[in-house]
Protein backbone atom coordinates (compact mmCIF):
# COMPACT_ATOMS: atom_id res chain seq x y z
CA UNK A 1 0.00 0.00 0.00
CA UNK A 2 1.22 3.47 -0.85
CA UNK A 3 1.45 6.47 1.48
CA UNK A 4 1.59 10.23 0.81
CA UNK A 5 5.09 11.66 0.61
CA UNK A 6 5.84 14.12 3.43
CA UNK A 7 7.70 16.63 1.24
CA UNK A 8 5.52 16.74 -1.89
CA UNK A 9 1.75 16.43 -1.65
CA UNK A 10 1.42 15.17 -5.24
CA UNK A 11 3.68 12.14 -4.68
CA UNK A 12 2.86 8.67 -3.37
CA UNK A 13 5.57 6.41 -1.95
CA UNK A 14 6.22 2.77 -1.14
CA UNK A 15 9.18 2.39 1.22
CA UNK A 16 11.24 -0.65 2.12
CA UNK A 17 9.88 -3.07 -0.49
CA UNK A 18 11.92 -6.31 -0.38
CA UNK A 19 13.22 -7.24 -3.82
CA UNK A 20 15.60 -10.04 -2.87
CA UNK A 21 16.83 -12.27 -0.09
CA UNK A 22 20.19 -13.96 0.42
CA UNK A 23 22.18 -15.84 3.00
CA UNK A 24 25.66 -14.50 3.69
CA UNK A 25 27.94 -14.68 0.63
CA UNK A 26 25.22 -16.33 -1.46
CA UNK A 27 23.59 -15.17 -4.68
CA UNK A 28 20.31 -13.40 -3.89
CA UNK A 29 16.92 -14.67 -5.04
CA UNK A 30 14.04 -12.45 -6.11
CA UNK A 31 11.17 -11.72 -3.69
CA UNK A 32 7.71 -11.31 -5.27
CA UNK A 33 5.87 -8.02 -4.70
CA UNK A 34 3.07 -8.13 -2.13
CA UNK A 35 0.79 -5.17 -3.02
CA UNK A 36 -1.28 -5.30 0.18
CA UNK A 37 1.62 -4.92 2.61
CA UNK A 38 2.29 -1.67 4.47
CA UNK A 39 5.23 0.18 2.96
CA UNK A 40 5.36 3.19 5.25
CA UNK A 41 8.92 2.78 6.57
CA UNK A 42 12.26 2.61 4.80
CA UNK A 43 13.91 -0.78 4.98
CA UNK A 44 17.18 -1.60 6.72
CA UNK A 45 20.43 -0.36 5.22
CA UNK A 46 23.31 -2.72 4.60
CA UNK A 47 25.58 -3.20 7.61
CA UNK A 48 28.34 -0.56 7.64
CA UNK A 49 30.57 1.51 9.90
CA UNK A 50 28.64 4.76 9.48
CA UNK A 51 26.78 7.00 11.90
CA UNK A 52 23.21 5.58 11.65
CA UNK A 53 21.77 9.10 11.76
CA UNK A 54 23.39 9.75 8.38
CA UNK A 55 21.34 6.97 6.79
CA UNK A 56 17.83 8.04 7.89
CA UNK A 57 16.81 4.39 7.90
CA UNK A 58 13.60 3.61 9.81
CA UNK A 59 14.78 0.05 10.44
CA UNK A 60 18.49 0.57 11.06
CA UNK A 61 20.97 -1.82 9.46
CA UNK A 62 20.87 -5.51 8.64
CA UNK A 63 22.45 -8.20 6.50
CA UNK A 64 18.91 -8.59 5.14
CA UNK A 65 19.03 -5.25 3.32
CA UNK A 66 17.83 -5.94 -0.22
CA UNK A 67 14.95 -3.49 -0.44
CA UNK A 68 13.93 -0.55 -2.58
CA UNK A 69 11.82 2.60 -2.38
CA UNK A 70 9.40 3.75 -5.08
CA UNK A 71 7.87 7.18 -5.65
CA UNK A 72 5.09 7.91 -8.16
CA UNK A 73 3.02 11.00 -9.00
CA UNK A 74 -0.62 11.01 -7.97
CA UNK A 75 -3.09 9.82 -10.57
CA UNK A 76 -0.71 8.48 -13.20
CA UNK A 77 -2.69 8.35 -16.46
CA UNK A 78 -0.10 6.70 -18.70
CA UNK A 79 3.06 4.67 -18.24
CA UNK A 80 5.90 6.98 -17.24
CA UNK A 81 9.66 6.66 -17.72
CA UNK A 82 11.50 5.31 -14.67
CA UNK A 83 14.60 6.76 -12.99
CA UNK A 84 16.51 4.27 -10.81
CA UNK A 85 19.05 5.70 -8.35
CA UNK A 86 22.07 3.67 -7.16
CA UNK A 87 23.66 5.31 -4.12
CA UNK A 88 27.38 5.87 -3.71
CA UNK A 89 29.64 5.59 -0.70
CA UNK A 90 32.73 3.77 -1.91
CA UNK A 91 30.87 0.42 -1.83
CA UNK A 92 31.16 0.59 1.99
CA UNK A 93 28.48 3.00 3.20
CA UNK A 94 25.22 4.68 2.15
CA UNK A 95 21.57 3.71 1.77
CA UNK A 96 18.44 4.31 -0.27
CA UNK A 97 16.97 6.13 2.74
CA UNK A 98 19.39 9.08 2.69
CA UNK A 99 18.10 12.51 1.68
CA UNK A 100 20.41 12.28 -1.33
CA UNK A 101 18.73 9.02 -2.42
CA UNK A 102 15.20 10.46 -2.17
CA UNK A 103 13.80 10.78 -5.70
CA UNK A 104 10.51 12.35 -4.60
CA UNK A 105 11.77 15.72 -5.86
CA UNK A 106 12.19 14.45 -9.41
CA UNK A 107 8.89 12.59 -9.23
CA UNK A 108 7.03 15.73 -8.09
CA UNK A 109 7.51 16.98 -11.66
CA UNK A 110 4.88 14.44 -12.70
CA UNK A 111 7.18 13.19 -15.46
CA UNK A 112 8.82 10.06 -14.01
CA UNK A 113 8.58 7.20 -11.53
CA UNK A 114 11.51 7.05 -9.08
CA UNK A 115 13.20 3.98 -7.56
CA UNK A 116 16.11 3.90 -5.11
CA UNK A 117 17.78 0.61 -4.21
CA UNK A 118 19.93 -0.89 -1.48
CA UNK A 119 22.64 -3.46 -2.16
CA UNK A 120 25.14 -5.30 0.02
CA UNK A 121 28.14 -3.21 1.07
CA UNK A 122 31.70 -3.74 2.28
CA UNK A 123 32.86 -7.29 2.90
CA UNK A 124 29.31 -8.63 2.66
CA UNK A 125 28.87 -7.41 -0.91
CA UNK A 126 32.32 -6.96 -2.40
CA UNK A 127 34.79 -9.35 -0.76
CA UNK A 128 35.95 -11.74 -3.49
CA UNK A 129 35.57 -15.31 -2.19
CA UNK A 130 34.79 -17.33 -5.32
CA UNK A 131 38.37 -18.66 -5.33
CA UNK A 132 37.41 -20.88 -2.38
CA UNK A 133 34.67 -22.65 -4.37
CA UNK A 134 31.92 -24.68 -2.69
CA UNK A 135 29.52 -22.42 -0.80
CA UNK A 136 31.50 -19.41 -2.04
CA UNK A 137 31.38 -20.21 -5.77
CA UNK A 138 29.03 -17.28 -6.52
CA UNK A 139 30.70 -14.82 -4.12
CA UNK A 140 32.09 -12.48 -6.76
CA UNK A 141 30.76 -8.92 -7.03
CA UNK A 142 27.71 -9.89 -4.98
CA UNK A 143 26.74 -6.23 -4.60
CA UNK A 144 26.68 -5.86 -8.38
CA UNK A 145 24.61 -9.04 -8.65
CA UNK A 146 22.19 -7.46 -6.16
CA UNK A 147 21.84 -4.42 -8.43
CA UNK A 148 21.07 -6.67 -11.41
CA UNK A 149 18.45 -8.53 -9.36
CA UNK A 150 16.84 -5.22 -8.37
CA UNK A 151 16.62 -4.27 -12.05
CA UNK A 152 14.96 -7.61 -12.82
CA UNK A 153 12.44 -6.93 -10.05
CA UNK A 154 11.78 -3.46 -11.44
CA UNK A 155 11.34 -4.84 -14.95
CA UNK A 156 8.78 -7.32 -13.64
CA UNK A 157 6.77 -5.11 -11.28
CA UNK A 158 7.22 -1.41 -12.10
CA UNK A 159 4.15 -1.44 -14.32
CA UNK A 160 2.04 -1.84 -11.16
CA UNK A 161 3.29 1.59 -10.05
CA UNK A 162 2.70 3.36 -13.36
CA UNK A 163 6.20 2.86 -14.72
CA UNK A 164 7.23 1.80 -18.22
CA UNK A 165 9.74 -1.10 -18.04
CA UNK A 166 10.93 -0.16 -21.53
CA UNK A 167 12.03 3.31 -20.41
CA UNK A 168 14.53 2.77 -17.59
CA UNK A 169 17.21 5.36 -16.85
CA UNK A 170 19.84 4.37 -14.30
CA UNK A 171 21.58 7.13 -12.41
CA UNK A 172 23.77 7.37 -9.36
CA UNK A 173 26.71 9.10 -7.79
CA UNK A 174 30.30 7.92 -7.32
CA UNK A 175 30.24 4.16 -6.53
CA UNK A 176 26.67 4.09 -7.85
CA UNK A 177 27.86 5.47 -11.18
CA UNK A 178 30.89 3.19 -11.34
CA UNK A 179 28.45 0.32 -10.81
CA UNK A 180 25.90 1.35 -13.42
CA UNK A 181 28.53 1.82 -16.15
CA UNK A 182 29.98 -1.58 -15.25
CA UNK A 183 26.63 -3.12 -16.22
CA UNK A 184 27.61 -2.51 -19.84
CA UNK A 185 29.91 -5.54 -19.42
CA UNK A 186 27.34 -7.68 -17.58
CA UNK A 187 25.21 -9.55 -20.16
CA UNK A 188 22.73 -10.57 -17.44
CA UNK A 189 21.72 -6.89 -17.22
CA UNK A 190 21.15 -6.43 -20.95
CA UNK A 191 17.65 -5.19 -21.70
CA UNK A 192 17.03 -4.04 -18.13
CA UNK A 193 17.92 -0.37 -18.78
CA UNK A 194 17.88 2.09 -21.68
CA UNK A 195 19.96 5.08 -20.53
CA UNK A 196 22.79 5.69 -18.06
CA UNK A 197 23.47 8.99 -16.28
CA UNK A 198 26.78 8.67 -14.44
CA UNK A 199 27.67 11.41 -11.97
CA UNK A 200 31.34 11.30 -10.88
CA UNK A 201 31.77 7.59 -11.61
CA UNK A 202 33.18 5.76 -14.63
CA UNK A 203 34.05 2.44 -16.25
CA UNK A 204 37.35 2.47 -14.39
CA UNK A 205 39.17 1.76 -11.11
CA UNK A 206 38.38 -1.94 -10.99
CA UNK A 207 39.91 -4.11 -8.28
CA UNK A 208 42.45 -6.43 -9.95
CA UNK A 209 41.82 -10.13 -9.33
CA UNK A 210 45.21 -10.60 -7.65
CA UNK A 211 44.43 -7.95 -5.02
CA UNK A 212 40.84 -9.14 -4.55
CA UNK A 213 42.15 -12.59 -3.60
CA UNK A 214 44.92 -11.11 -1.46
CA UNK A 215 42.40 -8.94 0.40
CA UNK A 216 40.33 -12.00 1.31
CA UNK A 217 43.44 -13.79 2.55
CA UNK A 218 44.48 -10.80 4.66
CA UNK A 219 40.99 -10.53 6.16
CA UNK A 220 41.09 -14.20 7.18
CA UNK A 221 44.45 -13.66 8.85
CA UNK A 222 43.34 -10.44 10.55
CA UNK A 223 40.36 -12.28 12.05
CA UNK A 224 42.60 -15.26 12.93
CA UNK A 225 40.35 -17.63 11.01
CA UNK A 226 41.74 -20.96 9.84
CA UNK A 227 39.09 -21.70 7.22
CA UNK A 228 36.97 -19.58 4.83
CA UNK A 229 33.94 -21.47 6.15
CA UNK A 230 34.28 -19.50 9.40
CA UNK A 231 33.41 -16.33 7.48
CA UNK A 232 29.83 -17.61 7.33
CA UNK A 233 29.38 -17.27 11.09
CA UNK A 234 31.84 -14.58 12.19
CA UNK A 235 30.38 -11.38 13.66
CA UNK A 236 29.55 -9.23 10.61
CA UNK A 237 30.76 -5.94 12.09
CA UNK A 238 34.09 -7.59 12.94
CA UNK A 239 34.31 -8.71 9.33
CA UNK A 240 33.66 -5.20 8.05
CA UNK A 241 36.23 -3.73 10.45
CA UNK A 242 38.82 -6.28 9.35
CA UNK A 243 38.61 -5.00 5.77
CA UNK A 244 39.23 -1.45 7.00
CA UNK A 245 42.26 -2.63 8.95
CA UNK A 246 43.78 -4.17 5.82
CA UNK A 247 43.20 -1.28 3.39
CA UNK A 248 45.57 1.72 3.19
CA UNK A 249 44.68 4.38 5.76
CA UNK A 250 45.55 7.05 3.19
CA UNK A 251 42.32 6.83 1.21
CA UNK A 252 43.78 8.49 -1.89
CA UNK A 253 46.26 5.61 -2.20
CA UNK A 254 43.28 3.34 -2.74
CA UNK A 255 42.73 5.15 -6.04
CA UNK A 256 46.16 4.52 -7.53
CA UNK A 257 46.70 2.38 -10.62
CA UNK A 258 46.36 -0.96 -8.82
CA UNK A 259 43.25 0.16 -6.91
CA UNK A 260 44.21 -1.38 -3.56
CA UNK A 261 40.70 -1.04 -2.21
CA UNK A 262 37.36 -2.83 -2.02
CA UNK A 263 34.76 -2.49 -4.75
CA UNK A 264 34.01 -3.91 -8.19
CA UNK A 265 36.39 -6.75 -8.98
CA UNK A 266 37.70 -7.32 -12.48
CA UNK A 267 36.45 -10.91 -12.39
CA UNK A 268 36.22 -11.43 -16.16
CA UNK A 269 38.61 -14.39 -16.09
CA UNK A 270 37.41 -15.95 -12.83
CA UNK A 271 35.30 -19.15 -13.10
CA UNK A 272 32.02 -17.50 -12.06
CA UNK A 273 32.86 -13.93 -12.98
CA UNK A 274 30.02 -11.44 -13.39
CA UNK A 275 31.87 -9.21 -15.86
CA UNK A 276 32.34 -10.72 -19.32
CA UNK A 277 34.64 -7.97 -20.63
CA UNK A 278 36.31 -4.77 -19.49
CA UNK A 279 33.52 -2.14 -19.37
CA UNK A 280 35.71 0.59 -20.90
CA UNK A 281 36.49 -1.76 -23.79
CA UNK A 282 32.77 -2.41 -24.23
CA UNK A 283 32.15 1.33 -24.55
CA UNK A 284 34.93 1.62 -27.12
CA UNK A 285 33.61 -1.37 -29.10
CA UNK A 286 30.21 0.21 -29.72
CA UNK A 287 28.40 -2.91 -28.51
CA UNK A 288 26.08 -0.68 -26.47
CA UNK A 289 26.09 2.40 -28.68
CA UNK A 290 22.28 2.28 -28.45
CA UNK A 291 22.51 3.25 -24.76
CA UNK A 292 22.52 7.04 -24.30
CA UNK A 293 24.94 8.34 -21.67
CA UNK A 294 25.49 11.35 -19.45
CA UNK A 295 29.01 11.48 -17.97
CA UNK A 296 29.96 14.17 -15.45
CA UNK A 297 32.75 15.36 -13.21
CA UNK A 298 33.24 18.30 -10.87
CA UNK A 299 36.12 20.74 -10.97
CA UNK A 300 37.48 19.90 -7.51
CA UNK A 301 36.49 16.27 -6.89
CA UNK A 302 39.41 15.16 -4.68
CA UNK A 303 39.68 18.46 -2.80
CA UNK A 304 37.04 17.06 -0.45
CA UNK A 305 39.82 15.06 1.21
CA UNK A 306 42.03 18.13 1.69
CA UNK A 307 39.11 19.99 3.24
CA UNK A 308 37.85 17.19 5.50
CA UNK A 309 40.73 14.84 6.35
CA UNK A 310 43.93 16.74 5.49
CA UNK A 311 46.18 14.91 7.97
CA UNK A 312 45.19 11.59 6.39
CA UNK A 313 46.19 12.55 2.84
CA UNK A 314 48.91 15.23 3.16
CA UNK A 315 52.05 14.12 1.25
CA UNK A 316 54.17 16.86 2.92
CA UNK A 317 56.45 17.35 -0.12
CA UNK A 318 56.10 17.78 -3.88
CA UNK A 319 58.73 15.07 -4.30
CA UNK A 320 56.39 12.63 -2.55
CA UNK A 321 53.57 13.57 -4.94
CA UNK A 322 55.77 12.99 -7.98
CA UNK A 323 57.10 9.71 -6.58
CA UNK A 324 53.52 8.53 -6.08
CA UNK A 325 52.71 9.31 -9.71
CA UNK A 326 55.79 7.37 -10.82
CA UNK A 327 55.68 4.30 -8.58
CA UNK A 328 51.95 3.94 -7.85
CA UNK A 329 50.47 5.26 -11.10
CA UNK A 330 53.29 4.24 -13.49
CA UNK A 331 53.67 7.72 -14.98
CA UNK A 332 57.16 8.46 -16.40
CA UNK A 333 58.98 10.94 -14.17
CA UNK A 334 59.29 13.78 -16.71
CA UNK A 335 55.59 13.46 -17.46
CA UNK A 336 54.81 13.35 -13.73
CA UNK A 337 56.81 16.53 -13.19
CA UNK A 338 54.83 18.28 -15.95
CA UNK A 339 51.55 17.12 -14.40
CA UNK A 340 52.66 18.34 -10.96
CA UNK A 341 53.53 21.74 -12.44
CA UNK A 342 50.10 21.93 -14.06
CA UNK A 343 48.55 21.06 -10.67
CA UNK A 344 50.32 23.94 -8.93
CA UNK A 345 53.76 22.67 -7.91
CA UNK A 346 55.90 25.61 -6.81
CA UNK A 347 52.84 27.78 -6.23
CA UNK A 348 50.60 25.76 -3.91
CA UNK A 349 50.89 23.24 -1.08
CA UNK A 350 51.81 19.61 -1.78
CA UNK A 351 48.38 18.63 -0.43
CA UNK A 352 46.53 20.76 -2.98
CA UNK A 353 48.81 19.61 -5.79
CA UNK A 354 48.06 16.00 -4.88
CA UNK A 355 44.29 16.45 -4.74
CA UNK A 356 44.28 18.29 -8.08
CA UNK A 357 46.23 15.42 -9.59
CA UNK A 358 43.73 12.87 -8.31
CA UNK A 359 40.83 15.00 -9.54
CA UNK A 360 42.24 14.83 -13.06
CA UNK A 361 43.58 11.26 -12.88
CA UNK A 362 40.55 9.57 -11.31
CA UNK A 363 37.71 11.76 -12.59
CA UNK A 364 38.42 14.23 -15.41
CA UNK A 365 40.53 11.81 -17.48
CA UNK A 366 38.15 8.82 -17.54
CA UNK A 367 35.17 11.14 -18.10
CA UNK A 368 36.77 12.65 -21.21
CA UNK A 369 38.04 9.35 -22.60
CA UNK A 370 34.81 7.42 -22.10
CA UNK A 371 32.64 10.19 -23.54
CA UNK A 372 34.96 10.35 -26.55
CA UNK A 373 34.96 6.56 -27.00
CA UNK A 374 31.16 6.29 -26.87
CA UNK A 375 30.82 9.09 -29.43
CA UNK A 376 33.48 7.54 -31.68
CA UNK A 377 31.56 4.25 -31.59
CA UNK A 378 28.39 6.00 -32.77
CA UNK A 379 26.70 6.48 -29.41
CA UNK A 380 25.05 9.59 -27.99
CA UNK A 381 26.75 11.00 -24.90
CA UNK A 382 26.46 14.29 -23.04
CA UNK A 383 29.40 15.50 -20.94
CA UNK A 384 28.92 17.89 -18.02
CA UNK A 385 31.45 19.75 -15.86
CA UNK A 386 30.09 20.95 -12.51
CA UNK A 387 31.75 23.96 -10.92
CA UNK A 388 31.27 25.45 -7.45
CA UNK A 389 28.36 27.61 -6.36
CA UNK A 390 28.13 30.02 -3.45
CA UNK A 391 28.42 27.94 -0.27
CA UNK A 392 29.02 24.72 -2.22
CA UNK A 393 32.60 24.02 -3.37
CA UNK A 394 32.79 21.67 -6.34
CA UNK A 395 34.02 18.78 -4.20
CA UNK A 396 33.04 15.18 -4.82
CA UNK A 397 29.32 15.04 -3.96
CA UNK A 398 28.48 18.70 -4.50
CA UNK A 399 25.77 17.72 -6.99
CA UNK A 400 24.06 14.94 -5.03
CA UNK A 401 20.95 16.88 -4.04
CA UNK A 402 20.45 18.05 -7.61
CA UNK A 403 20.61 14.52 -9.01
CA UNK A 404 17.53 13.46 -7.03
CA UNK A 405 15.65 16.76 -7.27
CA UNK A 406 16.08 17.82 -3.65
CA UNK A 407 17.35 21.07 -2.12
CA UNK A 408 20.46 21.03 0.05
CA UNK A 409 19.95 22.45 3.56
CA UNK A 410 20.78 26.18 3.74
CA UNK A 411 21.65 26.26 0.05
CA UNK A 412 22.36 29.62 -1.58
CA UNK A 413 20.24 30.72 -4.53
CA UNK A 414 23.25 30.11 -6.76
CA UNK A 415 23.50 26.51 -5.56
CA UNK A 416 19.76 25.99 -5.94
CA UNK A 417 19.93 27.24 -9.53
CA UNK A 418 22.92 25.03 -10.33
CA UNK A 419 21.33 21.96 -8.76
CA UNK A 420 18.01 22.64 -10.48
CA UNK A 421 19.85 22.58 -13.81
CA UNK A 422 21.11 19.10 -12.91
CA UNK A 423 17.59 17.95 -11.95
CA UNK A 424 16.08 19.28 -15.17
CA UNK A 425 18.90 17.72 -17.19
CA UNK A 426 18.14 14.30 -15.75
CA UNK A 427 14.39 14.72 -16.34
CA UNK A 428 14.90 15.80 -19.95
CA UNK A 429 17.31 12.91 -20.51
CA UNK A 430 14.97 10.31 -18.99
CA UNK A 431 11.95 11.58 -20.95
CA UNK A 432 13.79 11.81 -24.30
CA UNK A 433 13.60 15.60 -24.56
CA UNK A 434 17.03 15.82 -26.15
CA UNK A 435 16.14 19.14 -27.75
CA UNK A 436 16.29 20.66 -24.25
CA UNK A 437 19.84 19.41 -23.66
CA UNK A 438 23.14 20.75 -24.97
CA UNK A 439 24.92 19.21 -27.95
CA UNK A 440 26.26 15.68 -27.43
CA UNK A 441 29.95 14.92 -27.85
CA UNK A 442 30.84 14.49 -31.53
CA UNK A 443 33.15 11.89 -33.04
CA UNK A 444 36.04 14.31 -33.44
CA UNK A 445 35.00 17.17 -31.18
CA UNK A 446 35.00 17.60 -27.42
CA UNK A 447 31.75 19.20 -26.24
CA UNK A 448 31.39 19.82 -22.51
CA UNK A 449 28.62 21.78 -20.82
CA UNK A 450 29.99 23.99 -18.03
CA UNK A 451 27.83 24.95 -15.05
CA UNK A 452 28.59 26.70 -11.78
CA UNK A 453 31.42 29.15 -11.23
CA UNK A 454 34.26 28.33 -13.60
CA UNK A 455 37.89 27.94 -12.55
CA UNK A 456 38.44 26.91 -16.19
CA UNK A 457 36.58 26.23 -19.43
CA UNK A 458 35.74 22.54 -19.56
CA UNK A 459 36.83 21.91 -23.14
CA UNK A 460 40.14 23.75 -22.78
CA UNK A 461 40.93 21.95 -19.53
CA UNK A 462 40.02 18.62 -21.14
CA UNK A 463 42.46 19.22 -24.00
CA UNK A 464 45.21 20.01 -21.50
CA UNK A 465 44.47 16.89 -19.43
CA UNK A 466 44.47 14.64 -22.50
CA UNK A 467 47.86 16.00 -23.54
CA UNK A 468 49.38 15.77 -20.05
CA UNK A 469 48.18 12.18 -19.56
CA UNK A 470 48.87 11.00 -23.10
CA UNK A 471 49.69 7.29 -23.07
CA UNK A 472 48.85 6.91 -19.37
CA UNK A 473 46.30 4.15 -18.60
CA UNK A 474 43.50 4.70 -16.08
CA UNK A 475 41.84 1.25 -15.95
Could you say what each language-model-derived stretch is?
Residues 1-141, 165, 299, 409-424, ...:
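Non-catalytic accessory segments of hydrolases
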Residues 165, 172-175, 187, 200:
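Catalytic nucleophile serine of serine hydrolases
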Residues 88-89, 142-146, 174-177:
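Active-site loop->helix "elbow" adjoining a glycine-rich segment at hydrolase catalytic centers
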Residues 177-189:
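Short glycine-enriched nucleophile-adjacent loop
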Residues 81, 154, 161-173:
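Alpha/beta-hydrolase fold nucleophile elbow
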Residues 156, 190, 199-317, 355, ...:
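Substrate-access "cap/lid" subdomains that shape
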Residues 17, 358, 362-475:
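Mobile gating loops/cap/lid regions near enzyme active sites that modulate substrate access
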Residues 65, 137-159, 217:
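Alpha/beta-hydrolase active-site loop
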